[in-house]
Amino acid sequence: MLYQSSGLPTLYLQTASGSEKKIHDSKKNEETGTMLLVDAEGNTLHMGALSRIRIRGNSTTLFAKKAYQIKLDAKADLLGMGKAKTWVLLANVIDGTLPRNTLALNLTRAAGLPFISPCRAVDVYLNGEYKGNYLLCEKVQIGKERIAIHDLEEETELLNGQDLPAYGLVYGTAAQLGTPEESVNVTSRVKSLSKLPDWLKMKPGVWSARDIPLDPTDISGGYLLEVALKNNISTPARFTCDSGWKLVVREPGNASQAQVLSIFGIFQRIDTAIAQGDRDTLSGLIDMDSWVGKYVFEALLANFNAGASSQYFYKASGDDPICCGPVWDYDNILGISEVLSLQDTPTAHVHYPYDLFLRVTQLEPFMEQARTMYRDVHRPLALSLLGEGEEDTGLRSIAEEAAAISASRDMNFLRGRHYHESRLTEIGDS
């Protein structure tokens, strides 16, 4: 017997063991399994094997309601979102109203930001037990139907003839922080992540990479990077700029020394240009439209983690600039969190001293473009969310999004309220 709430598709997941204990114990653990996806009327949309199911996230792993990442045996188009193997189920555990992530992703897509993940609300059952309302969406990754830039890791792996994780790691410092790719002091080589020294967590001008012997001729792209908020070392390829700005190279996730130092050099020059207020140098290194658009979006939605957590960048190839995006993980927005003990800033909710947007907003040309973009692009979209817009933007209002998941939301909270009550603000409250 299959159970459903009204109005939403339902995803039924089954682990091979029939238990969730192994995967819930650690996000390093995974299982195989099966999945069944049905529409709101109970018609089968997809049925097949899972080569992987595991929990995902950082702080969300501490909650009873877990977020999941699943990998299908073969690419499939789920709910009209395009073919892919890897999919993410966001738990929206901080959001006591549930649609914040949906609103954010739809808003940025309407604003024209590139590579925004499509998303659909679904009910999820695991091993026959109802887990709640989730947001099914694509993983942030390089791919033809995802972030459509060159797959440098695939090319590197083909060149070396073996899986890149089989290689050890190399780490070191940049002797001249302004040009790390030109002057490098390699400290040592180790066989595993656990052997990397603790000082890599803290010092500026440090980096780590896979100790890979061969590099493609062109290593100018593509790269996908994420700001690393916490001082942990859980990924092979990473670096820290002068200001303490930490970045993880998500793709190629097993980047070589040459690859890490190449992209490190670009980000260090960006870091220096921002610190020195050198807008001419900065404009030659970054895609200003994407950076400004991302900032306006963060400020409009009052993102508590603006610029410091779940913040992505990508670089295509050649002389292409560093683009800001795609957007990801927006359940901590629109009044959920407050930091009352800190001074207000141009980004309102920023509270990290090395935060990207806190520093870049000191450049007046950046803010001039931000004001223009808000007036011409974002304000009409914001009015649509409030149900007050005169333009047909194609966006559903907050009230419409909430109504669409109302039955599922009621079911979700029958399992308990997973968020912090002290941090909850209903969407639309002042």
Language model segments and positions:
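Regulatory N- and C-terminal appendages and interdomain linkers associated
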Residues: M1-R52, A403-S430
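Middle-to-C-terminal accessory/interaction subdomains
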Residues: K21, F63, V248-A308, Y314-S430
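Short, solvent-exposed loop/turn and secondary-structure capping segments
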Residues: I23-S26, M81-K83, R100-N101, Y134-L136, ...
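Conserved oxyanion/phosphate-binding beta-strand-loop segments in alpha/beta enzyme cores
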Residues: E31-A91, P252-S262
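Structural recognition of the beta-strand scaffold that forms the well-ordered cores
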Residues: A67-K71, T86-A91, L98, D123-Y125, ...
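Internal "kinase-insert"/substrate-recognition segments embedded within catalytic cores
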Residues: A76-D77, A91, L113-S117, Y130-V296
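A conserved alpha-helical element in kinase catalytic cores
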Residues: V93-P114
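Short, well-structured beta-strand/strand-turn elements
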Residues: A111-D123, N303
